[in-house]
From Swiss-Prot:
GO MF terms, alphabetically ordered: electron transporter, transferring electrons within cytochrome b6/f complex of photosystem II activity
SUPFAM superfamilies hit by this protein: PetL subunit of the cytochrome b6f complex
Cell division in keyword set: no
Upper lineage: Eukaryota, Viridiplantae, Streptophyta, Embryophyta, Tracheophyta
Species in which this protein is naturally found: Phaseolus vulgaris (Kidney bean)
Record family assignment: Belongs to the PetL family.
Function: Component of the cytochrome b6-f complex, which mediates electron transfer between photosystem II (PSII) and photosystem I (PSI), cyclic electron flow around PSI, and state transitions. PetL is important for photoautotrophic growth as well as for electron transfer efficiency and stability of the cytochrome b6-f complex.
SS bond partners: none
Parts forming coiled coils: none
Descriptive protein name: Cytochrome b6-f complex subunit 6
Amino acid sequence: MLTITSYFGFLLAVLIITSSLFIGLSKIQLI
C-alpha cells in the first residue's frame, strides 16, 4: 500500500515538474 502511494506521489511530482518546465519553455519561446 505504501509503495503504491509513494509511486503515485512520485508520478504526480514528475508530471507537475514536466508541465511547469514545458510552460516555462513556452513562455521563453513567446518572448
